[in-house]
A protein has these predicted regions:
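Glycine/small-residue-rich loop that forms an oxyanion/phosphate-binding "nest" at active or ligand-binding sites
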Residues: 1-33
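A short alpha-helix capping/helix-coil boundary motif
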Residues: 18-19, 73-76
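Charged helix-capping and loop-helix junction motifs
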Residues: 64-73
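Glycine-rich phosphate-binding active-site loops on the catalytic face of alpha/beta enzymes
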Residues: 11-21, 50-63, 96-129
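Internal catalytic-core helix/loop-beta-alpha segment
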Residues: 28-43, 47-60
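Catalytic cores of alpha/beta
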Residues: 1-7, 33-45, 75-81, 85-86, ...
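Residue-level marker of alpha-helix boundaries and capping positions
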Residues: 29, 66, 86-87
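Short, contiguous strand/loop micro-motifs
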Residues: 25-26, 59, 82-83
């Protein structure tokens, strides 16, 4: 990755672990996770982790939430969900206060933004939330 002007690398469940070389210490590593166990496993090796699906998908029919609110609260209480963990899956503007209260460091919004009647206004509202 150091041969290209990338700011980082995003890993998925099928990706091998990525070990930074000496020249790559400033790059950001993020990873998609689909279980609390994966968050625990990769947290010390990544700058950011995306946990999904938190809510029922907005854009993928039949793709439901994988975690109960109780499970997420317990993970937050144990320090597993924190500022390094971003919520993904079914996230909309209305979810932001709940995600913040559960300890997520942020959220990735896809379907709600894609389906917004006024995406620019919706994005601005998200950024101000």
């Amino acid at each position: 990755i150091s041969r290209f002007p990338f700011g980082g690398v995003h890993l998925i469940s099928r990706s091998p672990e990525y070990h930074k070389t000496t020249a790559e210490q400033d790059i950001t590593i993020s990873r998609s996770c689909h279980s609390i166990a994966e968050i625990i496993q990769y947290k010390s090796k990544c700058n950011y982790l995306f946990l999904s699906p938190i809510y029922d998908s907005i854009s993928k029919e039949g793709y439901g939430a994988a975690f109960s609110r109780i499970d997420l609260k317990q993970a937050a209480d144990k320090g597993i969900i924190d500022s390094k963990v971003l919520a993904l899956g079914g996230v909309s503007l209305e979810c932001i206060p709940q995600l913040r209260s559960m300890g997520f460091g942020g959220a990735a919004v896809l379907g709600a933004l894609w389906q917004a009647k006024e995406p620019t206004r919706y994005l601005k509202a998200l950024m101000e939330a």
